[in-house]
């Protein structure tokens, strides 16, 4: 889990735009971030399988 300090640091405006990076709004994870949903792949998969993200359905072909 991300520490509170790292989450707060990510929420602050960076001095330079290239220093800004995205963190999951649910758990604070910095990797596997999905911009459209503002969360990491792990939280996205969990919430999508529970049906808590509107408009997301499981793909099958």
UniProtKB/Swiss-Prot annotation:
Annotated residues for binding of Zn(2+): 24, 27, 40, 43
Entry's cofactor comment: Binds 1 zinc ion per subunit.
A GO biological process held by the record: translation
Superkingdom classification of source: Bacteria
Record InterPro entries: Ribosomal_uS14, Ribosomal_uS14_bact, Ribosomal_uS14_CS, Ribosomal_uS14_sf
GO CC, one annotated term: small ribosomal subunit
Keywords assigned by UniProt, alphabetized: Metal-binding, Ribonucleoprotein, Ribosomal protein, RNA-binding, rRNA-binding, Zinc
Annotated Pfam families: Ribosomal_S14
Keyword Aminoacyl-tRNA synthetase included in the entry's annotation: no
Gene3D superfamilies per record: 30s Ribosomal Protein S14, Chain N
GO MF: rRNA binding; structural constituent of ribosome; zinc ion binding
Signal peptide segment: none
PROSITE patterns: RIBOSOMAL_S14
Entry cofactors: Zn(2+)
Description of how the protein assembles with itself and partners: Part of the 30S ribosomal subunit. Contacts proteins S3 and S10.
Role played: Binds 16S rRNA, required for the assembly of 30S particles and may also be responsible for determining the conformation of the 16S rRNA at the A site.
Record-stated family: Belongs to the universal ribosomal protein uS14 family. Zinc-binding uS14 subfamily.
Protein name listed in UniProt: Small ribosomal subunit protein uS14
Originating organism: Treponema denticola (strain ATCC 35405 / DSM 14222 / CIP 103919 / JCM 8153 / KCTC 15104)
Primary gene name: rpsZ
